[in-house]
Amino acid sequence: MSALLELVDVQRSYTIGESEVAALRGVSLTIERGEFVAIMGASGSGKSSLLHILGLLDTPDKGSYRIAGSDVATLSDDARASLRNHVAGFVFQQFHLLRRMSIEDNVRLPMLYSGVERSSNLQAEAIRRLEMVGLAHRLHHTPSQLSGGEQQRVAIARALIRQPAIIFADEPTGNLDTRNSLEIMKILQGLHEEGKTIVMVTHEPDIAAYADRIITMRDGVIISDERKATATVLPSSDSPFVLPTTAIAAWWHYKRLSGFVAQAMQAILANKMRSLLSMLGILVGVASVIAMMALGEGARVAMQEELKAMGSNMLSVRGGSAKIRGTSQGAGAVTRFTVKDVEAIAALRPLVRNASGVVNGSARVVYGNRNWSSSLLGAGYDYGTMRAALPTVGRWFTAEELQRRDKVAIIGVTVARELFGESNPLGKTIKINRINFTVIGLAPAKGFVGPQDEDDIVMIPLSTAMYRVLGRDYLSGIFVEVAEAHRVDEARQRIAAFIRQRHRLPVDDDSFYIRDMTEIQKMLSSTTRTMSLLLGAIAAISLVVGGIGIMNIMLVSVTERTREIGLRKALGARNSDIMLQFLVESAGMTLLGGVLGLLVGIGVALGLTLVAGWAVKISLFSVLLATLFSAVTGLFFGLWPAQKAAALKPVEALRYE
């Protein structure tokens, strides 16, 4: 029968600065099943290095190491991690209990990496192990609430949870007083009597005396190997020791993944303020994405509704801009439309139902001691019907008022609010660019289209605007209502030909253009889509900055938790387990930040509606996009810290100061 542990000519050296220090110099050793071995030696003798190799926390530079006849050198990292979990139990001088976890969770920690599905019996098993060391009543305490001796007993309970064949104890009484040291050694002695193989490192002869075999080391070599004449009689076992081959569940298995999620949440909540500050960048980024995209989408929908109200059979005729020697002459500099053009186009019946000219300008509106700067629109008689602008209160001006150039006005709700507050504006006299006008109507509320307030407007008769207020003899444009929607293209071609003929323009002249509402809708939709993408891109920069902040915090976390990583690997965590844990933590922080940012973004969007009156629309797409992007950001920026954590060697991580 092969030995349980067998070393042949093992050598191990470490590089310290520019010097190479030999820790083990050709050590050969055999340990049988059921032995209690104490390895003694002064500091620097190589005893801890030997224990680390025996416990699979380190690998030799030269020589061979076999466990139950299997060469460790042929095993993969995952296979060695599995052996640490199933075969070995570790008791450390520094206890290595995770301070943010309860005693019960510390004891159950090896089960996370065991490949065994979590069950209701797991808690009972943890309680049973704590009862063995006399700490069942401390189940929900944290390590900081225990004495040193109690913490070491918890470490022993943790080492036993997987029922290992071998207990590796590294100076188990080094940090304890005499009474606690005796209690720990009684527990180890009892485990040996139950058949456990125990390999213990100590520098105290009275502690080594508990063992049946004492190996003494000096300068990396074994100088003595003594066995007691009266060794403890162990229960006989005829069955050979076989290395376990338990399959590890895939990382996406929900029960295994839930363990990593629980661990990640504990890590996040353990440093609440730091986690919150780390999430802040993601929170701002997601809130910006939601608010900006809601604003852009709201503007697009508002414009679509307004264009829809205008009708799909509407044409807009505008004078184009000509260039002389490369210099633009401005809109309508060549082709200028007059009221006569409007009358001529309106006469194209039955193709055309109505036509109305418009002029645009700015107005300084004054009432009493209040004044307001607004947009001025001079419109024809049919404009109110054609553009859904008929007053909700009061009336539209008459054809006679238009002909007489009467000074009457329809004002938007914004102008009414600024000048009159809550009082009725009808019949009141206001000054528009220092000219007295009588308010005869209140225009229907249309709200905002993006940042543009459609209710900040004053409408007056076209003739009044041209000849009394603005002093113009040409129009800004003409709106044409086609009799039937399916004849819009025909009407556009007919009107274009008519204008060229009337103004004696060549066929290829581009000094005017005609657009229907569909074209305008496409143009505005394209513009708002571009603006939404631009705003979203700007907001996404915040997410990237937040992701960099997450990466920075995770790198700091890896450094702070180096010993914890070493402990987890000693308990059987694979490289992929460590990587997954840190990725879940990173993604968890960004997702939490994303959810908070989502709520803040929705609040900001609703606030813009309530306070500024802007049209906003929160789409499911923007919510899903922001949430997905925050998760991807966490995974992407958490990858490097996770890889760095996974690459740490167990023994180096445990030694980290």
Curated annotation (Swiss-Prot):
| Positions annotated to bind ATP | G41, A42, S43, G44, S45, G46, K47, S48
Cellular compartment(s): Cell inner membrane
Question: Where does this chain mainly localize?
Answer: membrane
List, in alphabetical order, the GO biological process terms annotated in this UniProt record. Answer: response to antibiotic
Q: Which PROSITE patterns match?
A: ABC_TRANSPORTER_1, ABC_TRANSPORTER_2, MACB
CDD domains named in the record:
ABC_MJ0796_LolCDE_FtsE (cd03255)
Instruction: Mention any Pfam family matching this sequence.
Output: ABC_tran
InterPro entries tied to this protein: AAA+_ATPase, ABC3_permease_C, ABC_transporter-like_ATP-bd, ABC_transporter-like_CS, MacB-like_ATP-bd, MacB_PCD, Macrolide_Exporter_MacB, P-loop_NTPase
Record-linked Gene3D superfamilies = P-loop containing nucleotide triphosphate hydrolases
* Keywords attached to this entry: Antibiotic resistance, ATP-binding, Cell inner membrane, Cell membrane, Membrane, Nucleotide-binding, Translocase, Transmembrane, Transmembrane helix, Transport
Q: Which domain of life is it from?
A: Bacteria
EC number of the protein: 7.6.2.-
Q: Name one GO cellular component term.
A: plasma membrane
Task: Extract one GO molecular function annotation from the record.
Answer: transmembrane transporter activity
- Give membrane topology per the record: Multi-pass membrane protein
Q: Where is the ABC transporter domain?
A: 5-244
Q: Where are the transmembrane segments?
A: 276-296, 533-553, 591-611, 620-640
Q: How does it assemble?
A: Homodimer.
Question: What family does this chain come from, according to its entry?
Answer: Belongs to the ABC transporter superfamily. Macrolide exporter (TC 3.A.1.122) family.
Function in brief = Non-canonical ABC transporter that contains transmembrane domains (TMD), which form a pore in the inner membrane, and an ATP-binding domain (NBD), which is responsible for energy generation. Confers resistance against macrolides.
Q: What is this protein called?
A: Macrolide export ATP-binding/permease protein MacB
Q: Which organism is it from?
A: Chlorobium chlorochromatii (strain CaD3)
